[in-house]
Each structure stands twice: as C-alpha cells, then as structure tokens.
Amino acid sequence: MISLQHVSLVRGNRHILDDVSIEMKSEQNWAILGRNGSGKTTLLEMMTGYMFPSRGRVEVLGHVYGQCDVREVRKSIGYISQSLLEKLTLSDPVWEVVATGAYAFLRFYQDIPEEARNLAYSLLNEMNFGHLAEQPLGTLSQGERKKVMLARSLMADPKILIMDEPCAGLDLYEREKMLQEIDNLRQREIMVVYVTHHIEEIVPLFTHVALMKDGRLTGAGTKEEVLNHELIKQTYDIDAQLEWDGGRPWIKVISGG
C-alpha cells in the first residue's frame, strides 16, 4: 500500500530525511517512533503528498507521486493531526464537523446531504458519542475533540488512516480512552500509520514499528523484532528496559543510563 524507496529531503545543508526505504503492506499497521525532529511528521507528509522528496520514489495505493493526481489518492487516505483540528470551527455542531470528512471540507456552506448526516451520527454512536452530536465542538474536552477527529477521518471509508500524534496533550484517562478507540480499528479493513513519541501507545492493533533518528531509519519490521534494548537505546540515546504487558510495550529508564 505504501512504498518509499531511497527517499531523501534536503533543505540547505540539512537532510530532513536521509535515504529512507520502507514497505508497508495492507495487512500491516505501523507505528513510527522517534525523538523530536527525527523526521516522523515529514515522513507522513511524504505519504500524503503534501511534501515531495528531493530524491527517491513514493508510491501509495499503486500510484507513484509525481506521476499521478495526488488529490485523487488523498481521497482514500484519512488524516488526523493537531494542525487540522485547529482549523475546524469550534461553533459547529459535532455531527457536522464529522460529516465534513466525507468531502474533505473544513465546514459546510450549503445544505448537508441526509446520507452524510446519518453516517456521522452512526460513527458517533459507534464511539458512544451520539449524545454529544448536537454540541458545539468548542464545548468538548481535548480528548473528546480527538475522538471527533477520528470519526471524521472514517467518513470517507479510507483505505489508509494516517495519525500524527493523536494522543498528544491528553491526560492519562483521555489517552487510554483514545487508544481504545484506535485499537478498535482492528474491526475495520483499513491500514493505520501512527506517529508518536511514546512506546506505550503501541496498542495490539499495531503489527510493525519503524524507529527514526536524524532523518534515518534505525529499525523497521515487526514490533517484536524492532522493540529491543539496543535499537531503543540507539534511537532515543537513553538506556532503558522494555517490558510487555497487556499486549503493549512499556519502557523503564535505567537509572544512570
């Protein structure tokens, strides 16, 4: 579904991405981990066609970027990010915000099709959010808004869902509720690509992990192969132990490491 071959992005003398090659298949769900500035978000922007490489080849859903209409490819990609959330209108009712996802609008300026309204309500009910459907988006907590973004991203029934730190800024309770909704995506035929700083956010949904440092991959493969002491130390520059509990990895920093 997603193939990057020897992708580099150069700005001045800086390699933001440096010879990145990775293959993501339809039956796989990927988490991308790394420190701030490691190139994670830039990698997502390559996948969505909002940035193009200085060198290399990007292929998504069988389409090679630079040889296709990227706007058409994006219709099959759901996207969640804080920057997108900030562009939405806080006074709009929740169901309407969700419904805009069917058309890639930020808000409606005309009558909303009944079909879109019904699907928006259905997705909100699926997430036990139906009681908030008529509330203005601005009255919701940060965690609730993130769930609205998730419902919105599913409106167009995408083949790929790309999430850029969807749990950033959430307290422990709201983070775990959001992660539960993300893990429930196992029930859908959709490939998920998820960027985070935090290893413990890798819920059982995710089958594969890519580790990034300074614009390069330090590891990529199944989560069992990649999440090990040596690669974590190499990626995060810290000595830590990794433990698995409840199908999720948890990290413990070694004192003095």
What are these regions, as identified by a protein language model?
Residues 161-164:
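Catalytic Walker B motif of ABC-type/P-loop ATPase nucleotide-binding domains
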Residues 234-257:
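ABC ATPase nucleotide-binding domains
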